[in-house]
Amino acid sequence: ETYPGEAFFSQYYVDKSSAEAQQRQGKYLSSAYCKGAWVTPIAPDAETVAPDQATSTISADYGYYDPTGDSFLQGNVVIDQQGRQIRAERVTIDQTQTYAKAEGNVQLAQSGLISQSDDINYNLKTQQGDLYNSFYIAEQQHAHGRAEKIAKTSDNTLELENATYSTCPPDQKPTWKIQAEKIKLNQETGRGETKNTKLYVKDVPVLAVPYFNFPIDDRRTTGILTPIFGFT
């Protein structure tokens, strides 16, 4: 890889003229400065079922079920929850069929979001969990980055620790990126918040602030607008 996460990001970053991008019918495409666009496995406007009503369909190369203890799945594991999906090399599910630990190139996809992690701890009933050592893509926000930990606290909220965030094309040195101790992305409000933040331009730090609030979608807000970075 020429930059961290290249193998993962290249799966979902496509040319705007490609058949995959055209399936979005012009929705969620990045700015005119970018030739490419993110296309994730589950579209941002895909219908989902409420966590307490969703059923899980599970497949794997090998499975072992123990009604008195943990159950194990190994090899091409897929857990499909009607609009949400986990893929992993290995998954352990507890006796109550509530908590799952997934390991090995774990991909979690839902409504325009996809991540790849070393491992995750996931509640199958609430569909919340913690992801460790992750790369992530947010299609609707044209964004990507990496994080030591991602906490999925609700369908609409992600909390990232020691993370980066950029809306530039994936590259070794993106035109700009935010690096922060904590990043909170709230799709319901359309805002992102960061703590102990540095702004990098071409991998050079140009600004450091203790707190930063920025839009993650196209909704209009009052107050100071964050800058839009362009390049030629």
Kindly label every feature range from the protein language model.
Residues E1-T232:
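Structural signature for solvent-exposed beta-strand/loop edge elements and short helix-capping sites
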